[in-house]
A protein has these predicted regions:
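Mixed-charge, low-complexity intrinsically disordered regions
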Residues: 1-15
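Catalytic cores of DNA base-excision repair glycosylases
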Residues: 15-271
Length: 271
């Protein structure tokens, strides 16, 4: 006896991200592998090391939003100098080409003091980073949200969560998106998440790793489906490096690009 339409199980709609990855494997075989290998040949292999404690990483990432890394680093150093803490100094690990070169070894700021600072004082302290009038209240609101949820400003508890659980916890905080959360989790904990900034997005679209209309926010999840966990960190570092060094927004240096043979920006018919 046939089931009535009302009792038939509805077929699940195909996952568009998984469908894209399968299509990519079918129509452009080995594109992902060739991209990873080409980038590694140019920029090397990278093992994860913690750059900063997670709260410092979060605040630094907020400071970098719509600002040059060098300016954001000056603002972070100003926080350290103005609101010193008595915590032990940490050894700073500068990243291979993703920023952080302007930071020194040292203790994180006193986050209680940063949260409680008069707003105009905090604006003046982080002014070197740019957009201080917008970022100062955002920093305090973020610190307040963390403290009210956890009792202090530490984010070390995120290490006990899965990458997606930790990302969801962070993105529930007003003003924190997938990119900011993924930067923190990748650099502070080595979690296999891709933080899609403008460099990663540009390279990904030009090579054809993600759909032409995919947004940066959507691209985070394309990479989760596309890469193995042990590939994510190195791919992240090298994509950022490539976007900064060769695949510029204007006048990309095609003649020295390690991805040239497979880049649809160079040749729309590239295999």
């Amino acid at each position: 006896m046939k089931r009535s339409p009302a009792t038939r199980k509805k077929r699940r709609a195909p996952d568009p991200i998984k469908a894209w990855v399968k299509r990519l494997e079918r129509t452009r075989p080995n594109l992902v592998r060739d991209t990873l290998d080409g980038l590694a040949a140019r920029y090397g292999h990278h093992a994860w090391e913690r750059r900063l404690d997670p709260t410092s990483e979060l605040i630094l990432t907020i400071l970098t939003q719509n600002s040059a890394d060098t300016n954001a680093e000056k603002a972070f150093e100003a926080l350290r100098a103005t609101y010193p803490s008595d915590r032990p100094a940490e050894r700073h690990i500068p990243g291979p080409g993703w920023g952080g070169e302007g930071l020194s070894d040292g203790a994180p700021p006193d986050w209680n003091a940063v949260e409680a600072a008069p707003i105009q004082e905090l604006v003046d302290v982080i002014r070197p980073g740019g957009l201080a009038n917008q970022k100062a209240p955002r920093l305090q609101a973020t610190l307040r949200t963390i403290r009210e949820a956890r009792g202090d400003h530490s984010l070390e508890f995120l290490a006990d969560m899965s990458p997606l659980e930790a990302r969801a916890w962070l993105t529930a905080i007003d003003g924190i998106g997938k990119k900011t959360a993924s930067v923190l989790l990748a650099f502070s904990f080595g979690m296999p998440l891709m933080a899609v900034d403008r460099h990663v997005e540009r390279v990904s679209h030009r090579v054809g790793l993600i759909p032409p209309k995919a947004t940066a926010d959507e691209a985070h999840d394309y990479y989760l489906a596309m890469l193995a966990p042990n590939e994510m960190y190195e791919a992240h570092v090298n994509l950022i490096r490539h976007g900064r060094v060769i695949c510029h927004a204007r006048n990309p240096e095609h003649e020295i690009c390690p991805l040239r043979a497979r880049c649809r920006f160079v040749d729309p018919k590239a295999p």
